[in-house]
Amino acid sequence: MYFTRDPVIETVITSREGYKLSIRNSKHLSQDPFVVEAVEVIRLGGTSFFRNCDHSKPFLVPAADYEVMEVRDAKINLKAVGLDRGVKIVSGREALLKMPRVAPVASVQEESSSSLEEGIIEDPVVATPSPASAAPMSKKEKRKEFKNEKWKEKKKQGRRRNSKEIADAVGSSQDMIDTITEECLQESSPEERDPCERRFALIPPPTRLISEGPEEPKESQPVTAVDLNESLNALVSESCDVIESILADEDTVIFTKESEKSSNETQELSSHSLEEASVHDRISSEE
């Protein structure tokens, strides 16, 4: 937002560590509240307003219709619980967690010292106003100094907290890795010494008892190669023998086409002879 004349900042309300400010509409409770870390109380004429210090999410609401409440931030609690729970589940050894950690602490000290040096370098730059605009810009300078100090303290605290959590997590993970490697080495050392002990297999029981005596070896039958042509010739000869034995039997009767023709001819001849005999009888009787 841009103003033709900057409003008067009455005070700045900030939340404690682990808490946040909730600016809620007292007349319309269904409206979602604004959850911020700091809020400014400004005055325009005779009316007071709440303005967010974080310019990425700006809002300007009348102070008469809104109320400010301090609520606990749930993110910090969840993060702390997750770290503690993860360490307890994985390691389970309190002695390893209590071991001194030298390297992470040194890195934390270096980060804190660098952040302090940056704050010391930035302070004189912000706090050195131009002499020409010293009188009319006094309120702005005070407001900027106050905001910068508050935000610097919060940034330092957040960096220290994050660096401590990272150092604890790195140290615990390093301890767990060391213990796991030691256990793996301890488990692998007996395997390398006695490789034959682990190599075993279940042998089926013998089919004969020792009291029955040794089993005599069976004579292996010689395997001979069979020629296909010889086997076919043998089958043909056997089939011919079977057919000849069937034909040689006296009880069998053979019906062929020639026998059928001869039987038909004999029947025709007998019928002709009968007709001729009947004709001769008639002629003789007439005479």
From Swiss-Prot:
Bias type Low complexity, positions: 110-136
Biased composition (Basic residues): 153-162
Coiled coil start-end: none
Region (Disordered): 109-175, 203-223, 257-287
Biased composition (Basic and acidic residues): 143-152, 273-287
Family label: Belongs to the chlamydial CPn_0623/CT_504/TC_0791 family.
Protein name: Uncharacterized protein TC_0791
